Amino acid sequence: MTKPKLLLTLVLLIPFRLLAQDPNLLDMLDKEDKAKPSTDYATATFKTTRLINAHSIEHLTSGVLDVKISHRFGTLNSGFYELFGLDNASIRIGADYGITNWLMVGLGRSSFEKQYDGFTKVRLLRQSKGAKSMPLTLSGFAGMYYNTLKWADTSRNNYYSSRINYVFQLIAARKFSEGFSLQLSPTLVH
């Protein structure tokens, strides 16, 4: 074998360190990601959209339908005749729908005063930290209730407007830790 061929073979067979295979490329990518400011939003401030009989700060995500059957029982001291409150139970069947991640609507029917109801809940602010920092989540809630009971006294003027109730809430909540969240819900009922 001639010297130039031998030299060429040795050069081709000697492994070279390639920079493209440098393990620091992942580190460089991590540095780029850390350099970009990110926003972390608080999730699961509460586990559902309701707190007992009231609305929580939580919203359904876009396209989610949530059907709920809620019960309120009578008093336990009513005795065996009323089956300790079971006979006095009032029930509500409703469907809530997430139109967008910040807009939610719902319709329902309750056995209490034979009411039909509808509501809209809008997320105004969302708790976050990072690039966009917000200390709390704020939502607006508006609901309307329509009473369908028969009029008790048909001899007097019974106005349609007497059957309608409205409620407005400004729901403010903060998730302090995984185990503690606080919500305030100032309410106006008409």
Regions found by a protein language model. Give the residues of each.
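Bacterial Sec-dependent N-terminal signal peptides
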Residues: 1-24
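Transmembrane beta-barrel domains of Gram-negative outer membranes and organellar outer membranes
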Residues: 21-157, 164-168, 176, 180-184, ...
